[in-house]
Amino acid sequence: MSLNFLDFEQPIAELEAKIDSLTAVSRQDEKLDINIDEEVHRLREKSVELTRKIFADLGAWQVAQLARHPQRPYTLDYVRLAFDEFDELAGDRAYADDKAIVGGIARLEGRPVMVIGHQKGRETKEKIRRNFGMPAPEGYRKALRLMEMAERFNMPIITFIDTPGAYPGVGAEERGQSEAIARNLREMSRLNVPIICTVIGEGGSGGALAIGVGDKVNMLQYSTYSVISPEGCASILWKSADKAPLAAEAMGIIAPRLKELKLIDSIIPEPLGGAHRNPEVMAASLKAQLLEDLADLDVLSTDDLKNRRYQRLMSYGYA
């Protein structure tokens, strides 16, 4: 897979382009007298060191760009890599099936679980079909239907959050967008089974929180979680989206800051360069964290689960 490099990764992109050129020349003419392999190896080591140096000092705006990376693994990628026997379930039994939310029953190391998450889509047609990962009310009602099903069958619930926000269209508002989100917040706080939520990309506002009330809340290293996008915040405060980098720093949208504020429990490390560089390794780390969280929650009573979850929800907004 050819990698897409972000603006701040251009020095890395230039090195990788040189490596690709040398590799192509080597393949075309195997009778070359010079030792290209040594040069390629040297450049690869230099690329790794440069990547390590750049990623050791990322700002909040750069992390926000990584969270939106077009090659970043989505919910269905993690379902494929970390779970077995996934059986997708569709529809809210009231209006429609919202493709921006996917969910179904799967097995995690043999244990039945309910997996629910946002799905953005990659190609243009799929992005449109998935509405760029922005759910309408029927998406959140589908998610709630699946969560209530999980409760009936005593299955843990695992959610993956990756959305710029709930869809703000007129139709969505007419069908009760705010009510659907509010109902999910209330009902998730009352469910009798363990809930583990993980932000895998963008955690945008109420659209993220509507499947984000859990007993454990994790974030991938280069994901974000905020009440508004940096561009939206900049447009309101400075009347210019160009101030988005400044807004990103001020908002505290990155995982270390949110863990410091006790809004999340764990930060799951990503491979060097981000999750898209090695989805298999990222999925293995995510799976290990989910299994660890389930083991911690299995020893708690139902009342303890609900009390802790409710207190977490009520603590949001307090310093």
From Swiss-Prot:
Please give the pathway this protein is involved in.
Lipid metabolism; malonyl-CoA biosynthesis; malonyl-CoA from acetyl-CoA: step 1/1
Top-level taxon:
Bacteria
Which EC number(s) are documented for this chain? 2.1.3.15
The record, for InterPro entries, names:
Acetyl_CoA_COase_a_su (IPR001095), ClpP/crotonase-like_dom_sf (IPR029045), COA_CT_C (IPR011763)
An example Gene Ontology CC term for this record: acetyl-CoA carboxylase complex
Print the keywords alphabetically.
Answer: ATP-binding, Cytoplasm, Fatty acid biosynthesis, Fatty acid metabolism, Lipid biosynthesis, Lipid metabolism, Nucleotide-binding, Transferase
Give the SUPFAM superfamilies listed for this entry: ClpP/crotonase
Residue intervals of the CoA carboxyltransferase C-terminal domain? 35-296
So which residues are the signal peptide here? none
Q: Give the chief site where it resides.
A: cytoplasm
| Matches recorded under Pfam families | ACCA
Q: Name one GO molecular function term.
A: ATP binding
Name the reaction it catalyses: N(6)-carboxybiotinyl-L-lysyl-[protein] + acetyl-CoA = N(6)-biotinyl-L-lysyl-[protein] + malonyl-CoA
Q: Where in the cell is it found?
A: Cytoplasm
Task: Look up the record and give one Gene Ontology term from the biological process aspect.
Answer: malonyl-CoA biosynthetic process
Family the entry assigns: Belongs to the AccA family.
Quaternary context: Acetyl-CoA carboxylase is a heterohexamer composed of biotin carboxyl carrier protein (AccB), biotin carboxylase (AccC) and two subunits each of ACCase subunit alpha (AccA) and ACCase subunit beta (AccD).
Family annotation (NCBIfam families): accA, AccA_sub, PRK05724.1
Physiological role:
Component of the acetyl coenzyme A carboxylase (ACC) complex. First, biotin carboxylase catalyzes the carboxylation of biotin on its carrier protein (BCCP) and then the CO(2) group is transferred by the carboxyltransferase to acetyl-CoA to form malonyl-CoA.
Record-given protein name: Acetyl-coenzyme A carboxylase carboxyl transferase subunit alpha
Q: Which organism is it from?
A: Salmonella arizonae (strain ATCC BAA-731 / CDC346-86 / RSK2980)
Taxonomic lineage of the native organism? Bacteria, Pseudomonadati, Pseudomonadota, Gammaproteobacteria, Enterobacterales
